[in-house]
A protein has these predicted regions:
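Sec/Tat signal peptide C-region and signal peptidase I cleavage site
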Residues: 16-20
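Low-complexity, intrinsically disordered regions enriched in charged/polar residues
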Residues: 8, 30, 111-115, 200
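Bacterial N-terminal signal peptides
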Residues: 7-15
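Short, charge-rich amphipathic segments
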Residues: 21-24, 56-58, 106-120, 142
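Surface-exposed beta-loop interaction hotspot
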Residues: 96-135
């Protein structure tokens, strides 16, 4: 009986949302191929998402409404170790970015901060058509206002998914857009299509593999 009781406790603990759940994706851009690993856990009313892609690690801290409160990006090869936190509509940036020291503040544009829209757009747009938000562009750490818009059902890699398009706002909307794909039942992220670079850059395609 003791063994059965202990086994039940272990199963309960491992199934608890406080423990990390792991998801792996494959990213392809031209001839380049990389693995992306997501690990998430929920504890003390916070959501923690850890993302690893090659030499780069991202840590996101979100509240129950999926609003980003903190984002940390680390890449030793690029001499980057930067933390951004939001308090009272003011972003605090501290650390190093591409070898340059940063210690400054930036005022929010007044939108909700969703630094990793792939994580939560499926849930956010379940009963909405559009969601405005803001995020920092990872390659230059500039703050942009964005719009995510539900596009309905669409096939992605042979599977029915909920498609969501994300673009810049205003006049900039004509210059960049990308597509995210979500499982219609779990609302979890399963894929991405978009050009992440200058004109002529091959399209990046991300798909879930396990």
């Amino acid at each position: 009986m003791k063994h059965i009781h202990l086994y039940s406790i272990i199963v309960l603990l491992l199934s608890s949302p406080a423990f990390a759940q792991k998801t792996t994706y494959l990213s392809k851009c031209g001839d380049q191929q990389e693995t992306i690993v997501w690990q998430e856990k929920k504890t003390n009313g916070k959501i923690y998402l850890y993302v690893t892609q090659e030499n780069e690690q991202h840590e996101y801290v979100m509240n129950k409404s999926f609003q980003t409160e903190k984002w940390k990006v680390t890449n030793i090869q690029l001499q980057t170790d930067l933390t951004i936190e939001l308090r009272n509509n003011i972003y605090s940036l501290t650390g190093k970015f591409k070898g340059k020291s940063i210690a400054k503040t930036i005022k929010s544009n007044g939108y909700v901060w969703y630094q990793n829209i792939a994580y939560n757009a499926g849930v956010l747009l379940k009963d909405k058509k559009t969601v405005k938000h803001e995020c920092f562009r990872p390659d230059n750490i500039k703050l942009y206002a964005m719009v995510a818009e539900a596009q309905g059902m669409e096939q992605f890699m042979g599977t029915n998914t909920n498609k969501i398009e994300v673009c810049l706002t205003g006049l900039l909307s004509a210059f960049w857009t990308c597509s995210y794909y979500f499982n219609p039942e779990t609302l979890s992220f399963v894929g991405y299509k978009g050009v992440n670079g200058k004109p002529g850059t091959p399209e990046t395609i991300i798909k879930i593999i396990k």
